[in-house]
Amino acid sequence: MDFHVMTLFPDMIMDGLNTSITGRAIKSGVMSVTAHDIRDYSNDKHLKVDDYPYGGGAGMVMRAAPVCDCYEDIVKNIGKRPRVIYMTPQGYTFTQKMAEDFAKEDNLVILCGHYEGIDERALENIVTDYVSIGDYVLTGGELPAMVVIDTISRLVPGVLNNEESAETESFSDGLLEYPQYTRPADYNGQLVPEVLLSGHHANIEKWRHEKSIERTKKYRPDLYEEYVKKHSDEFR
């Protein structure tokens, strides 16, 4: 899978993603990340890409031309017009289901805004998906873009060592993940649940499922209610 990030800070993107699991996946060729510097498409001798907003107001707005020209260059290089995710607090809140949908694409473009935003005409021309990682404002779209890429990349075949891990983590089935334990079995009097030491796989799976439900009900009642609606037979 190929990610293309349109940004004013390409080093921030690459430094953040060239480590850990995503870094390993990039080095192995399972996925690629290219940070496209929007400033490279400015016709200003100082590579300026912003200007004052029409109608007045605080801050600056990113101009349409550099953004659109950057996108068209990506289209030219990959040979098609891919989906474009614009990271914005005004977008739909990012979820695991959205990540699963995006993971079906061969190419994804992620647009990172800055200043007071981007000229609306650029957004109308190229953006297909408006996505937010939460109801708060950051200084730019780079950190949200990395969150989105990290989440999607875990669903790309070959990125994770254990193919099952992406399927059993929190949210994959609408529930939070069950508690995890490792050695020693006794840590200062705190014991690992006996069922996990039993070797009885059916009982272990039953325990894990029950704990996932308990944890979801306690920490994410909204998800719990949704799960109950979809699995009403389980609670009769």
UniProtKB/Swiss-Prot annotation:
Pfam families: tRNA_m1G_MT. It is found in: Cytoplasm. One of its GO terms (cellular component) is cytosol. It comes from the Bacteria. One of its GO terms (molecular function) is tRNA (guanine(37)-N1)-methyltransferase activity. GO terms for biological process: tRNA N1-guanine methylation. Keywords: Cytoplasm, Methyltransferase, S-adenosyl-L-methionine, Transferase, tRNA processing. InterPro entries: Alpha/beta_knot_MTases, tRNA_m1G_MeTrfase_C_sf, tRNA_m1G_MeTrfase_TrmD, tRNA_m1G_MTases_N, tRNA_MeTrfase_TRMD/TRM10. It catalyses: guanosine(37) in tRNA + S-adenosyl-L-methionine = N(1)-methylguanosine(37) in tRNA + S-adenosyl-L-homocysteine + H(+). S-adenosyl-L-methionine binds at G113, I133, G134, D135, Y136, V137, L138. The keyword Transferase applies. Its EC number is 2.1.1.228. It is an enzyme of class 2 (transferase). Coiled coil: none annotated. Homodimer. Specifically methylates guanosine-37 in various tRNAs. NCBIfam families: PRK00026.1 (NF000648), trmD (TIGR00088). PANTHER family: TRNA (GUANINE-N(1)-)-METHYLTRANSFERASE. Belongs to the RNA methyltransferase TrmD family. This is tRNA (guanine-N(1)-)-methyltransferase. It comes from Lachnospira eligens (strain ATCC 27750 / DSM 3376 / VPI C15-48 / C15-B4) (Eubacterium eligens). The gene is trmD.
